[in-house]
From Swiss-Prot:
The gene is nscD. PANTHER family: INDOLE PRENYLTRANSFERASE TDIB-RELATED, PRENYLTRANSFERASE ASQH1-RELATED. Transmembrane segments: none annotated. It is an enzyme of class 2 (transferase). Pathway: Secondary metabolite biosynthesis. This is Prenyltransferase nscD. GO terms for molecular function: prenyltransferase activity. It comes from Trichophyton equinum (strain ATCC MYA-4606 / CBS 127.97). GO terms for biological process: alkaloid metabolic process.
Length: 436
């Protein structure tokens, strides 16, 4: 991990911090600086976002690691993650748009992992409230209205212990040509019965409470009908995860996350097109199929009606493949937007091979500005030999269709715990160079 000059300049004039915050700043602050530098952010925007990260994100990451085992295993980053409470995303740009950088955190506080806060929601709500007072564009009206509908009514002690875990996450998007930080909140129902009631009871009532009794629910109702009556849509399973934009109510989107275990490309295409109701050109479907097969390590000649080959873990057990999607619900739209997620953490393809495949796709189709800058970021976070031989940096690639091209985002992990010993050597070396 090599330092970026602007990170050094900002660090030089920061006030003293405690040991935990110093650690997280030296690791994740440098990651953020590298991403913005490679993405071509203006220098003033880099400084602005680094200061936001230092004072509004770092204090929420909790105690610094003391071993390669997390004291609290966060759900940020999905199955690829090592329990670290932060991960990143890089939304590849287009010919006329620079990449967009985001981070996702599960805020950790004094009550995290204690009986006083079994759902780890206190620190998150405090952080969101702080954002609403310091970021002019943040509006929590929709979130405060939705959140009570997702909070479980748990009474029995045994249920509390069984269902304890993360219930909220926060995302922060830092666009290069803006002076705002866009905030998103993600809610996770802990009780299974809540998930089954999401489309029929919880979301309709939450949307009426937020937007008024006469709110148009066409888009939400379409998702429910698609998942109950369509031959392809009925194979989808709700995860319960729901994302919501923390902005003015009229601009707020609600994202509903689902999964499928059908891995045939014909099925993937049917979900992306909503059973043909949202057409996608054959050219774009062909691009998506080629990328899907390459990232999943499937042979190019595999028929589109066939399931992906089942992967076998080192211990001989089978590695089930699931495909996540989200539906983007907006009251003013009759149909939802759709985004697919390609999980590369369980793919036989190495992290470096997956990243190279995406960069190749972007270069072949003239998408993105200097997509190889993304490779520079990955190689700075993790040595090339680890990217070639190990898994864990890359979590997902998401793919949507925007303006007749594939809109691709990479989600990846800092590996703070997995690379704990390497970070210790790096930081101790830094400390010696400062005090010698």
């Amino acid at each position: 991990m090599t330092s970026v000059p602007i990170f050094e300049s900002v660090s030089r004039f920061l006030p003293p911090a405690n040991e935990d915050e110093q650690y997280w700043w030296k690791i994740t602050g440098q990651h953020m600086a590298r991403m913005m530098h490679e993405a071509g952010y203006p220098e003033d925007r880099q400084v602005e976002c680094l200061l936001f990260h230092r004072f509004k994100v770092i204090p929420c990451l909790g105690p610094r690691p003391r071993s390669d085992t997390p004291w609290y295993k966060s759900r940020v980053g999905g199955g690829a993650a090592d329990g670290c409470p932060i991960n990143y995303s890089w939304r590849f740009g287009t010919a006329d748009r620079k990449p967009h950088i985001r981070n996702f955190i599960e805020p950790l506080g004094a009550l995290t992992n204690t009986p006083a806060d079994p759902l780890n929601e206190v620190a998150t709500k405090a952080l969101l409230q702080d954002y609403s007072m310091t970021l002019p564009n943040v509006d929590l009206e929709a979130f405060w209205t939705f959140a009570p509908h997702y909070r479980p009514r748990i009474i029995e002690k045994a249920d509390i212990e069984k269902l304890a875990g993360a219930s909220l996450l926060v995302g922060a998007e830092m666009s290069p040509d803006s002076h705002t930080i866009d905030i998103k909140a993600y809610m996770y129902p802990r009780v299974p019965s809540q998930t089954s009631q999401l489309l029929t009871t919880i979301l309709p009532q939450a949307m009426r409470d937020a937007y008024g009794e006469n709110v148009c629910l066409d888009s939400l109702n379409f998702v429910h009908e698609f998942m109950t009556k369509d031959p392809q849509g009925s194979q989808l399973v709700l995860t319960g995860t729901t994302g919501i934009d923390c902005c003015k109510l009229q601009d707020t989107r609600v994202k509903i996350y689902v999964i499928t275990r059908n891995t045939s490309f014909d099925h993937i295409a049917a979900i992306m097109t909503l059973g043909g109701r949202r057409p996608i050109s054959e050219e774009l479907l062909g691009q998506l199929k080629a990328l899907w097969y390459e990232l999943k390590g499937a042979p190019a000649e595999l028929p589109s009606s066939e399931q992906l080959p089942v992967q076998t873990k080192p211990d001989g057990s089978k590695n089930p493949i699931v495909v996540p999607f989200y539906f983007d619900i907006q009251p003013r739209l009759a149909l939802p937007d759709v985004k697919a997620y390609i999980d590369v953490s369980t793919s036989p393809v190495s992290d470096l091979a997956a990243a190279n495949a995406v960069v190749r796709h972007l270069e072949q189709h003239g998408s993105g500005q200097n997509p190889k800058a993304y490779l520079n970021v990955l190689k700075d976070i993790t040595p090339v030999e680890e990217l070639e031989t190990q898994k864990g940096v890359l979590a997902f690639y998401s793919v949507a269709v925007k303006k007749n091209e594939l809109d691709i985002t990479s989600y990846f992990n800092p590996q703070v715990y997995k690379r704990y010993f390497a970070h210790e050597v790096h930081l101790n070396g830094q400390r010696r160079s400062v005090f010698e």
